[in-house]
Amino acid sequence: MSKAKDKAIVSAAQASTAYSQIDSFSHLYDRGGNLTINGKPSYTVDQAATQLLRDGAAYRDFDGNGKIDLTYTFLTSASSSTMNKHGISGFSQFNAQQKAQAALAMQSWSDVANVTFTEKASGGDGHMTFGNYSSGQDGAAAFAYLPGTGAGYDGTSWYLTNNSYTPNKTPDLNNYGRQTLTHEIGHTLGLAHPGDYNAGEGAPTYNDATYGQDTRGYSLMSYWSESNTNQNFSKGGVEAYASGPLIDDIAAIQKLYGANYNTRAGDTTYGFNSNTGRDFLSATSNADKLVFSVWDGGGNDTLDFSGFTQNQKINLNEASFSDVGGLVGNVSIAKGVTIENAFGGAGNDLIIGNNAANVIKGGAGNDLIYGAGGADQLWGGAGNDTFVFGASSDSKPGAADKIFDFTSGSDKIDLSGITKGAGLTFVNAFTGHAGDAVLTYAAGTNLGTLAVDFSGHGVADFLVTTVGQAAVSDIVA
């Protein structure tokens, strides 16, 4: 084994642009405290979840089996008295597509909470019905009743279908009809709108929102565009809508009925090569539009966005948001969820790990990769890649990160977030001075190390291993 013989002081003068980009994106979606959005208070996930709930609006577990078992019926007829009671007219049955998509929407709720749905005429802890109407309700596109509204109302949802309004006739992945189904089912389960507003009651706007995150970027129970929170779910001129509950919806429904930890409790891949069995969690083409929040019960899990060519920003931390496949803030991770791995695509990606032992692959492009804590396995892929570290604890001796494809002259190891521009002194052996760094490389194994004594105790408190030799000029400090 040979040691680098260079003795130099390398300084970035300050934290690098790469570190600043990582740091900025990691805090972009911070919530709560004294933060504001558009002059409105910023709510934490827990605060937003509470905002979605209403006192007494929940089903009871009558048989004590630890979950809410609901039955449902697609109505085949409705009397004039029933229609009059709801202020509507022009009944029609759900078509085959509506029925199939309603089942998928219900499944998305049962995935995240202890709720089951069975098509049956009656029974269970509560009963739900679905039907269409052609006029009434002041032109509302759909409406539903929260539990506790009263007999003949609980579990009821209605959908406008006529020659002037057709989205509810053709619900499908990521379209407004599918979101409407999932939204209305959310009401029948006990979730309200995030604010005190309803369609047909005045002309509500985002100005009526109580808090800043009341948008469809955080909750599909919201009326307001994700653009209000600087997110963008449009691609190729087509807007995508969530087909399953989003980050705040998941927290809210779990407050009511508990979390379903049986969902995706094994090793699960989201995005490309998905094994979720859920259309809205899967991608097969660069043209796909993903809008989802990850709920995962356990295992070793992966966000695989390798099939996208756009520049992406991926964050593996719980309650975080990512920019995936040309959209902005379109993928989030629910509170309490750990996702271990992330795969970028062909663009210039920014990827942030968490404190688990992550596997991060940048793919093609000039990527910025930050593994954070844990013994991470890192691949930059083709291109000029920068591996960023923000604390000595990000890669400790005994739990060191390993870069599997380091190419000297193209790739960088960026420690400027630790040194804050103070630089490093490259030596052959530690001298007891803070900032001493030792580079080693063994040609026989093609393995190198970068060890740094940040504390000045004469031993390394930071260590990263490389497959491939790193030179002093490859280190940004």
From Swiss-Prot:
Ca(2+) 1 binds at residues 264, 266, 268, 296, 298, 301. The active site is at residue 184. SMART domains: ZnMc (SM00235). Coiled coil: none annotated. One of its GO terms (molecular function) is metallopeptidase activity. InterPro entries: Hemolysin-typ_Ca-bd_CS (IPR018511), Hemolysn_Ca-bd (IPR001343), MetalloPept_cat_dom_sf (IPR024079), Pept_M10_metallopeptidase (IPR001818), Pept_M10B (IPR016294), Peptidase_M10B_C (IPR013858), Peptidase_Metallo (IPR006026), Serralysin-like (IPR034033). Hemolysin-type calcium-binding repeats lie at residues 343-360, 361-378, 379-391. Ca(2+) 8 binds at residues 453, 455, 461. Ca(2+) 2 binds at residues 299, 301, 338, 340. One of its GO terms (cellular component) is extracellular space. Ca(2+) 4 binds at residues 354, 356, 358, 371, 373, 376. Optimum temperature is 40 degrees Celsius. At higher temperatures, the activity decreases rapidly. Shows high enzyme activity with casein as a substrate under the storage conditions of UHT milk. Is highly thermostable. Withstands general ultra-high temperature (UHT) processing (138 degrees Celsius for 18 seconds) in skim milk, with 88% of the initial enzyme activity remaining after heating. The milk matrix has a protective effect on the enzyme activity during the thermal process. Gene3D superfamilies: Collagenase (Catalytic Domain), Serralysin-like metalloprotease, C-terminal. Peptidase able to cleave azocasein and the milk substrates beta-casein and Na-caseinate. Can withstand UHT processing of milk, and is able to spoil UHT milk over the storage period. This is Metallopeptidase AprA. It comes from Pseudomonas marginalis.
